[in-house]
């Protein structure tokens, strides 16, 4: 239970960082949120709670840990960032005080209702508005494709690359 581990480490002031990915069978390093978006939301709920309730915990370093074997790596990163933004925005909607009260009174039904209410909220319009206000692309993948960024990078760098492992 990753969100429980995150919560425990945050409350003890020991969570230094977090690698985001998704998996189907073991450590597949799939696009963040592609298989288990609700789990991603629950992890962010734990992060939000931990950041709000333990000033001793250092602000965790976050990293996307994915392997881009099938998809364009930049498109995969954009999809991962979208999933992260969406899960984080939804986690910010959770009424942490009510959730803590429901947990303390063992009201599992209310806990589920509070979490699922936030999870089912469509935050994509808010994320698009935020991007627009900061001068970013409302639809990053569409812009990336329209601007032919991949082709420009290939033209600039070439098709062949060598990984040395260093």
In which residue ranges do the predicted regions lie?
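Histidine-acidic metal/acid-base catalytic patches
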Residues: 1-166
């Amino acid at each position: 239970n990753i969100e429980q581990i995150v919560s425990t480490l945050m409350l003890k002031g020991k969570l230094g960082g977090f690698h985001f990915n998704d998996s189907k069978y073991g450590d597949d390093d799939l696009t963040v949120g592609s298989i288990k978006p609700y789990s991603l939301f629950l992890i962010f709920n734990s992060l939000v709670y931990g950041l709000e309730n333990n000033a001793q915990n250092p602000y965790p370093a976050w990293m996307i840990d994915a392997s881009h074997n099938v998809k364009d790596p930049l498109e995969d990163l954009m999809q991962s960032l979208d999933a992260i933004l969406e899960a984080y925005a939804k986690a910010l909607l959770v009424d942490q005080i009510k959730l803590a009260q429901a947990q303390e009174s063992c009201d599992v039904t209310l806990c589920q209702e509070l979490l699922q209410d936030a999870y089912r909220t469509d935050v994509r319009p808010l994320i698009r508005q935020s991007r627009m206000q900061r001068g970013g692309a409302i639809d990053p993948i569409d812009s990336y494709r329209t601007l032919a960024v991949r082709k420009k990078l290939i033209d600039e760098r070439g098709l062949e690359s060598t990984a040395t492992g260093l």
